[in-house]
């Protein structure tokens, strides 16, 4: 199993050859390309400019032996999904992210559920479900046209009725599109009271398109390194092996979540993190 990490963990910008080289030297051959920030220039690109930008990044990554296997679609904090106009604007940016995902050669664009009532309340669960059902039915059709899949992500928001892996799985099955699968976030599982391995098994190989791997103590989405929180990593690896997961083990943590690290200490810690990822991935393959 390959291991991966987000572009921002190593790269200062899209042209950072030294960052690519260091990433590859530390054992990573897979990458998540982050498009969460809706102010990124790519969202203002004309189609030809977007193609040039994404193809240039893909070629640079591949020249270093790294493939972009997944991306992260647009996201605003706090959520801005309350009105039809806001959801339409978000939909358009997500379509851009799906096209960019295809141009990068990735197969999955990770996207969060729509949160029309915010992230800490759910006064109308049926309305929340209907909005998301309509939204992702349309968006998954666009994903199919692009030749990619949405990885609908479980959320660390216990108040929402569309946050837990089982709820995400139910929506994905109801829509039933080849363009809609699941990204399982291990840290988010813990915040909603579930061990990641217990979430992996019901999803299964066919619908588990991507991973976000990190840890916490169950009280908040802290993006800590694996083995520093409450996740049962042996069981998580076992579950991945049981379902035959074939994607990369993608970290969603880095030195940024470790604290302010002196420059001369950074690389040994980066290597340590990559070895942790390698341990989890190897355990999944051997189990």
Which stretches of residues belong to each language-model region?
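Glycine-rich, proline-tolerant flexible connector loops at the mouths of alpha/beta enzymes
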Residues: 32-57, 119
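Active-site acidic/histidine proton-transfer and metal-coordination neighborhood
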Residues: 60-67, 79-181, 191, 271, ...
């Amino acid at each position: 199993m390959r291991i991966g990490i987000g572009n921002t963990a190593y790269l200062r910008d899209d042209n950072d050859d030294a960052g690519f080289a260091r990433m590859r030297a530390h054992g990573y051959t897979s990458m998540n390309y982050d498009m969460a920030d809706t102010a990124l220039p790519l969202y203002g690109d004309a189609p030809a400019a977007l193609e040039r930008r994404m193809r240039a990044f893909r070629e640079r990554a591949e020249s270093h032996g790294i493939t972009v296997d997944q991306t992260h679609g647009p996201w605003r904090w706090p959520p801005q999904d309350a009105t039809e106009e806001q959801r339409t604007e978000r939909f358009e940016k997500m379509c851009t992210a799906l096209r960019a995902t295809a141009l990068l050669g990735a197969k999955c664009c990770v996207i969060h559920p729509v949160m029309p009532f915010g992230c800490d309340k759910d006064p109308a669960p049926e309305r929340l479900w209907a909005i998301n059902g309509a939204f992702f039915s349309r968006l998954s059709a666009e994903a199919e046209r692009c030749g990619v899949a949405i990885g609908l992500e479980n959320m660390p928001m216990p108040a929402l009725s569309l946050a837990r892996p089982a709820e995400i799985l139910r929506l994905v099955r109801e829509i039933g599109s080849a363009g809609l699968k699941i990204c399982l976030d291990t840290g988010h599982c813990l915040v909603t009271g579930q061990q990641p391995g217990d979430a992996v098994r019901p999803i299964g190989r066919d619908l588990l398109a991507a991973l976000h791997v990190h840890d916490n103590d169950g009280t908040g989405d802290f993006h800590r390194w694996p083995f520093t929180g409450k996740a049962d990593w042996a069981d998580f690896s076992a579950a991945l092996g049981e379902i035959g997961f074939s994607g990369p083990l993608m970290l969603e943590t880095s030195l940024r979540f470790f604290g302010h690290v002196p420059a001369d200490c950074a690389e040994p810690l980066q290597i340590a993190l990559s070895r942790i990822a390698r341990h989890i991935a190897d355990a999944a393959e051997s189990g």
